[in-house]
Amino acid sequence: MSVDTELVHPVADDWDEAAAAEAKSTLQQVLSASHLLGSNRALANFGGGNTSAKGTATDHVGREVPAIWVKGSGSDLATMSDRDFTPLKLEEVLPLFDLAEMSDEDMVAHLARCQLDPAAPRSSIETLLHAFVPAAHVHHTHPDAINAIACAENGKAFIAECFGDDAAWVEYIRPGFALAKQVGAAVRENPNLKLVVLAKHGLVVWGDSAREAYEKTIAVCSQAAEFVNVKAADRARFDGATGTVSLGEAERGDTLTQVLPVLRGAVSADGTSKILIADLSPAATELVDSVAGPTLTQVGAACPDHLVHTKRLPLWVAFDPGADDLGTLKQRIRSGVATYRDDYAQYFAENASVNDQMAD
């Protein structure tokens, strides 16, 4: 490999026993583990993934009842507080496993009635996935190492090769009742199972403690990273051909100083000022310098999780430092952004549901 011998980096185990010892309650324990998972973006993008813990809680009349706390909608693992978990009455949730099917609307309405605290956040669409896995702690993440395999065309075979009988594979299905039941059934039917991989989605692991579930996530992701790196070791990235030569550091800085304001102005034309972040990493420049770059960037997102943070396709702006001047580049940026905006508006109009609204 031309840039980095590791296509996917192993994930460090950041468990802090001293900090964990301060987490006395079940809720504090799952919160501590959530912060560790969310602080590593190789495990979960902003807002992605969710965690849960089962235990007992006091209901509104003072009774101790079996409960499950699940990360609620709208929070991020890295920064969430205990108030971002939704506590539910477990005995009113578990019977749903025996149903053959359930609509999203019925599921959401049922879970709302199961909440121990009506003021808690709305239940995650993946609440039942956590409830149906018979373990005290369940961690669901979207790790780079796992999705590098799970998003591959032959991902199922690769997962079997990497993990053997330790893993179950679930074909892609939108989060909701059906996915939760498939995951729950896989775990219940095989007590020796250690992980479930969701195609084009992510990873589910579990344990008797927050630490066990967290460290299993780390171990599984490290094993997947090693597998991917070995498989990719002798393969050239991006077809192995260079299309353009990167600018030197000084010239690159001068070029960015001149063109970034043009790009910022173009993407802020709707009246909403944008902030730009330039990724100058070797991995990024290897892609944009490659012959295959213009084609590969237009394939589409590898998994739905990416679409939460990006649009369907990126804008590719052609630029050859050896042949094009900055005036040409600036004009391509302006016209490219304008065309992209029109194309996206048409795409949205053709695919939007009745109540969908375009955010930007």
Residue ranges and their predicted role:
Residues 1-360:
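Glycine-rich flexible loops
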